[in-house]
Amino acid sequence: MANILKKPIFWLITLPVLAAVIWLFMLPDQANTATVDPVAYRAELQAERDKKDEYMRTNAESPIPDKATFKGLTYFEADPSFRVMAKLEPFPEGKAEKLVIKLTDGTDEIYEKYAHATFTVDNKACRLLVLKFQNSLSVLFQDATSGQQTYGGGRYIDIDLDAVANNQVVIDFNAAYSPYCAYNPSYACPLPPPENKLPVAIKAGEQYVQK
């Protein structure tokens, strides 16, 4: 391979798509997913997915090798119940640990441990390590769908720092996306830390099947 493209995970999607992800965490009344209008939520989410398909199909920075035959990404049906309020257990300020994250090409990148997020899915207690890179937060995770309906190397969720309040934040698994290396091996992408393997099937967000 002549040149391995290495991009931090926060730049694996363009600004318009990132803005859409941020919007999902800024929905009103984050403390209760039942307050989200499911019809409006699904409509807005579908609009953003359509926008991402257009980007993947037409933009020169898209990882899709054969854009002419690309018909769109495949997703689980939008489900507001996978938009969960997580409690954060932050690492002490000024004492945050660094974490070496392996990339798919065998190299490393250094991230900062921001907090552990605890929440429930299907009445099961879950815990994920939230990482910080520059001024953004991200969750890199695997679950029971990894390697089956979703990319085996895991999926990502980006979180805006401003969405954190009182050591709580909404994690919307409907916004989970596959890294670029899922579609193009020229990209080197971070792998989830071993502790971020959820014991449940997260049937939300992007699947690993093209239409």
Where are these regions (language model features)?
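Ser/Thr/Pro/Gly-rich low-complexity linker/stalk segments immediately outside membranes or between
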Residues: P28-A43
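Short, Lys/Arg-rich N-terminal segment immediately upstream of the first membrane anchor
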Residues: M1-K6
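A mature extracytoplasmic/lumenal domain signature
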Residues: L88, K132-Q134, D143-T145, F173-Y177, ...
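C-terminal partner/receptor-binding element of secreted or periplasmic proteins
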Residues: N184-K211
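Extracytoplasmic/periplasmic/luminal assembly and interaction segments
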Residues: E48, N59-L99
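Acidic, glycine-rich flexible loop segments
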Residues: D143-Y177
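Mid-length scaffold segments of soluble, non-membrane domains
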Residues: P92-G154
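Hydrophobic membrane-insertion alpha-helices, especially the h-region
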Residues: F10-M26
